[in-house]
Amino acid sequence: LYKESCGNCPILESHRTNDLSKKVIARKSKSYAKVPSLTVVGVSKWMAVCAGESSLFSNRKIVNIPNCLDVNLFKPIDKNIVRDLFNIPRNKKVILFGAANPTTDQRKGGKELFESIKLLDLKSVVLVIAGSTRPEKVEDFKYPVYFISPLRDEVSLPMMYNIADVIIVPSLEENLSNSIIESLACGIPVVSFDIGGNSDMIEHKKNGYLSQNISSKDLAKGISWVLEYDNYKKLSSYSREKVLKEFDSKVVAKRYIELYKDVLDGQ
């Protein structure tokens, strides 16, 4: 609906043509018309395309500049040290899944992940669920499950990522996932569905695995591929390299400076 003029907004559960969404988009259209040099930034290629399809921005300049990351904060840390801190076994391969309300928010793909875990045929594996306290009822997995309560500080987050051998981000809706960028910056390959801006960060079978279908079976295939890959160090190194090249705060800041210059030169 945003491609035309809104109304009957599904987010508002509205069935009226002249609802709040229609009034808001009309007001925005009137306001934006007063700024002829308005430039739109989509933080993912997918979002930039969506912006170009909208009635508000179809005739505007649209660029893609991603969110940035402090690569000095999110970086590889010795796994043995951080696993000891979180009481995770040193001698196991760790699958990490984390999100706010990861076991109850359907959009986070918990159902798809748990189904995929049951399909795995791997040895010496544990599952770590971050961002959630242990629920009263725990899924019956063939692998041990550890829970890490929500972490909010910038010191413990990178440490948590570094306990993992692979991080799963099975969200069914994403723009440009902070979790994916942060994981890759720590040198941890990521498995996710090929939706939203995920392909901006994950290069299939170079620093992770992109499942082309919303499929638990393919997600399981991706997890197995990462954990059994014969050159894991290469995956890990390229994960970090990708972030340094495209998402480092210095790199992104330079792109914004160039954009501001272009906008000012065009006025």
What is each residue range found by the language model?
Residues 17-62, 69-73, 79:
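A short, active-site helix/loop in glycosyltransferases that binds the activated sugar's phosphate group
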Residues 158, 177, 181-185, 199-200, ...:
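Short alpha-helical segment that forms part of, or immediately flanks, the ligand-binding pocket
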